[in-house]
Structures are given as structure tokens and as C-alpha cells.
């Protein structure tokens, strides 16, 4: 997993005293399998969560995802998955070809860090689409958050800690 934003989120989560697991979906990097555009990747997430739960015993589960990982997290939740906290970044309303994404519902209260200038769905568009989500907008950045990548990790880690009552 070489995405600097995802790596920063994992570091920030670990910095508040939580375990952080990040992984490549099938067909990405050195992972086996073939990418399916989000269909079978929900199974990858389910297996990663099962492994994390096995390692962590009864500790609470918090999920975070960026872009494709955020959509996959939402799909997993829509299929009945449960987490104690959910904090996402860069939730795309449009695909890489700028076609509308068919997103599953965003559970009420989901925390989302959005980019004001996100080419796949601005903060304003996300607020209109998901009025019951807790959305924090970072100004002056696009989908990849540029120089505000570290801020994304801090916001997510702090929110997860608060949601899990760790602060």
C-alpha cells in the first residue's frame, strides 16, 4: 500500500493508540487476484476485518477509507457490516470517468473529510447528497488533498478516538 494519504491516515490512527491495518485490494500492488471494480473487493475488506478482529480480540472496530476504499467501506456497511466508528475521506460522487457513482447509502452520522475542490465530488455536493453525514471540508485542495494530507489523517484519527470515547 503505497498511497501517501492512506499511509498518513494509518500513522495518525496509530498515534492515538489504536491498531491500524491497511492493505491492497485484489489485483493492486503485489496482491493476488484480479481487480473487479468494487464488486469482489468488498470480500477483501470483509476478510481483512475478520483477520483484524481475530488479532484484536474484543477491541472496538473503526473503519476508514479513502476514495475507492471509502466506497468499498460503504458497500460493506450496506451489506450488513457493523463498525463502532466510520471515518472516510474523498468519498467520490463521480467515477474516474466522471460518470455518477452508484453509491450505497451513507449511514447517518458518518464522518467524512471532503475536499472543497474535489473533481469527483466537492464538499458542497457531498453535503447536498448526504445531509445527515458529518462533513468537514478542507479548502483549496482537490481529491488527493495535496499539502493537507496530514490534516486528513489527524481529523480522522481524532474523530475515531472521540467516537470510540478514547479521548
Where are these regions (language model features)?
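Catalytic histidine-centered segment of alpha/beta-hydrolase-like enzymes
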Residues: 32-33, 141-153
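Gly/Ala-rich beta-loop-alpha elbow adjacent to hydrolase catalytic centers
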Residues: 64-73
